[in-house]
Amino acid sequence: MPIMKPVMTPDCTFSQEHIELLGIISEGRMFRIHKARRGTKYIILKSAVRNDAMTTEFLRREYELGSTLSHSSIVTTLGFEEDTPAGPALILEYVEGQSLDEFLSAGPSDSAKDCIIDDILDGVDYLHHRGVLHNDIKPSNIVVNPHGAARIIDFGLSISDDSVYKGCMGGSSGYSAPEIMAGKGPAGAASDIYSIGLLIRQMSGRKYRRIIDRCCRHNPTERYQSIPALRRAIAHRRYLPVAV
């Protein structure tokens, strides 16, 4: 696939300002996440550990998908530039907060956890309505801000209806649906719903036990088939005085 010319963020004044790297937040096998500043704004840079054509194209693809998304529960993609202090990089909104694991370690209330569940469902429902599967829903890809609102991040493994990557495995072994781990690729919304079920188990396992069991069935056709269906089941459970 040919490498395209650099894509700049639409805000030309913002894009021409110098980027100052402030530190590495995390580093994986392929990518580094940097906190940075451009002018007076904090931003996130996602750059390749090994700068080559393949990883640059992955970053560009993530930009092309992320730039089409706009939702309060999804991190904003600002641009992609090849000439940054970190090399070719995806430029993202900086979200102050902590990972879902860190948030849960503080022992939040049931109502606070329910708000997080609702935010995740809102964000994933928006993605699915736009023909996008996140394909890597896990605690480290959920950021909780100081107000207790959740944002979904990292669309590097996401798949859209017109994607040439539909058959890719993707996901993280601890949270991926069985069909993905078997190399069959995602089974539509049901694969993201499997991962959401595991997140709900981690947050409120006892409260939503039967709902989780259905989310996490091995056969994707036996799971909830859409976020609205899952949302209705959760709303019904919250209304009941005892576990169902």
Feature-to-residue mapping (PLM):
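Conserved catalytic-loop aspartate of Hanks-type protein kinases
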Residues: 192
